[in-house]
Swiss-Prot record:
One of its GO terms (molecular function) is glutathione transferase activity. The gene is maiA. GO terms for cellular component: cytoplasm. Residues 88-211 form the GST C-terminal domain. SUPFAM superfamilies: GST C-terminal domain-like (SSF47616), Thioredoxin-like (SSF52833). PANTHER family: GLUTATHIONE S-TRANSFERASE YFCF, MALEYLACETOACETATE ISOMERASE. This is Maleylacetoacetate isomerase. NCBIfam families: maiA (TIGR01262). It comes from Pseudomonas aeruginosa (strain ATCC 15692 / DSM 22644 / CIP 104116 / JCM 14847 / LMG 12228 / 1C / PRS 101 / PAO1). Keywords: Isomerase, Phenylalanine catabolism, Tyrosine catabolism. It comes from the Bacteria.
Length: 212
C-alpha cells in the first residue's frame, strides 16, 4: 500500500495510526501542503485525487481511496484484526459517535483552508486563535464527558475513538489549547505517548518531518 500523506495533517495522522495499530506495511509518499503553493494543488497529484487533499491510500489492488473515514473503514473491513471497533453494537455506536464528533464537528473548523479564508476575510491572528480555541474547546469538553474514566476512550485497548482523538489533541496543543481541563482526555494523550503504534504515526516521526 502507498499512503499519500503530510506529516502534520490530522487526517493523515489518523490513517497512520490505524495502519500502525493493525501492523500493516505501507510506503509513505509525502505531499507537501506548503511548498510552492502546495503539492496537493499540482496537476500530478490532482490527477490521482481530484479533491486535492490528503490522505489518499493506494491499496494493493491499485485502487486509490480518499477521505480518512472511508480509508479507516476499508482497513477495518479488509484487515479486521486487531479490531478498532467493539463487537458490541451499542459500544460500537458510541465509539463511532466520538470519532464523528472529532472528525465532523471539531477538525473541519480549524482546517487550514478554513483558517486561510478567515484571514482573507480580514480577521487578524488573535481572532483566528479565538476561533480555534472556541471550537476545539467546545468539542473536547463534550468528548471529555463521553469517554470512559479509565484506560483508553472505551476500554483497555486503543480503538477508533482514540484513532480520531489523539491527532486532534496534537492539533489542539499546536494551536495553544491546553488539555489541563480535561483529565480523561489527558489520560488518553499520555497512553498514546507511550504506545509504539501512536509514536510511529506521530508527526515528529515522519519522512517529511522538517529537521529540528
Amino acid at each position: 500500500m502507498k499512503l499519500y500523506t503530510y506529516y502534520r495533517s490530522t487526517s493523515s495522522y489518523r490513517v497512520r495510526i490505524a495502519l500502525a495499530l493493525k501492523g500493516l506495511d505501507y510506503q509513505s509518499l509525502p505531499v507537501n501542503l506548503i511548498r510552492d503553493g502546495g503539492e496537493h494543488r499540482q496537476p500530478a497529484y490532482l490527477a490521482l485525487n481530484p479533491q486535492g487533499r490528503v490522505p489518499a491510500l493506494q491499496v494493493d489492488e491499485g485502487e486509490l481511496l480518499i477521505q480518512s473515514p472511508a480509508i479507516i473503514e476499508y482497513l477495518e473491513e479488509r484487515y479486521p484484526q486487531p479490531a478498532l471497533l467493539s463487537s458490541d453494537p451499542l459500544r460500537r455506536a458510541r465509539e463511532r459517535g466520538v470519532a464523528a464528533l472529532v472528525g465532523c464537528d471539531i477538525h473541519p473548523l480549524h482546517n487550514a483552508s478554513v483558517l486561510n479564508l478567515l484571514r482573507q476575510w480580514g480577521h487578524d491572528e488573535e481572532q483566528v486563535r479565538q476561533w480555534i480555541g472556541h471550537w476545539v474547546g467546545q468539542g473536547l469538553a463534550a468528548v471529555e464527558q463521553l469517554i470512559g474514566d479509565q484506560g483508553w476512550c472505551f476500554g483497555d485497548r486503543p480503538g477508533l475513538a482514540d484513532v480520531y482523538l489523539v491527532p486532534q489533541l496534537y492539533a489542539a496543543e499546536r494551536f495553544g489549547v491546553a488539555l489541563d481541563a480535561w483529565p480523561r482526555i489527558r489520560r488518553v494523550a499520555d497512553l498514546a505517548a507511550a504506545h509504539p503504534a501512536f509514536r510511529q504515526a506521530h508527526p515528529a516521526n515522519q519522512p517529511d518531518t522538517p529537521a529540528a
